[in-house]
């Protein structure tokens, strides 16, 4: 039996068979016209894809950077306060969990929860890890790298989330 596998790039081109925002992270934030009638955007022009990249960039997608000197994770958590977030390190992984109870917004009541897990490079100094939340809701998790051959230290511990009053300097891609 052959199963057709479709690349995510073409997923939105199928219009009404794959609703763009009905079941993703934006659930409960209200719908736009093209969410209910996604095939209309393709009638304007076959090259017009309004929500393809906007949805990806605004859906809480994280950015991981690992260069020679440091390891950094940027994660959009604008709907969560520092009290709603838990960041902990277990072995070679960092786990970021966010949950807020049901609260009222413009469209009714909503509760949110997410869980992300990232593998830390083996040369990240786990004793010097830090995590901060900017005023615009960007969580930044970072840690310096140590030279090869130096013990980076591995232990299970919680990382406190500090609040910054200035907006994030993270790229918006």
UniProtKB/Swiss-Prot annotation:
Sites where the protein binds Zn(2+) 2: 107
Subunit description: Heteromer composed of three CRYAA and one CRYAB subunits. Inter-subunit bridging via zinc ions enhances stability, which is crucial as there is no protein turn over in the lens. Can also form homodimers and homotetramers (dimers of dimers) which serve as the building blocks of homooligomers. Within homooligomers, the zinc-binding motif is created from residues of 3 different molecules. His-100 and Glu-102 from one molecule are ligands of the zinc ion, and His-107 and His-154 residues from additional molecules complete the site with tetrahedral coordination geometry.
Positions carrying Phosphoserine are: 45, 122
* Modification type Deamidated asparagine: residues: 101, 123
Q: Where does Zn(2+) 3 bind?
A: 154
Briefly state the modifications made to the protein after translation. Acetylation at Lys-70 may increase chaperone activity.
The name this protein carries in UniProt is Alpha-crystallin A chain
On this chain, the residues bearing Deamidated glutamine are: 6, 50, 90
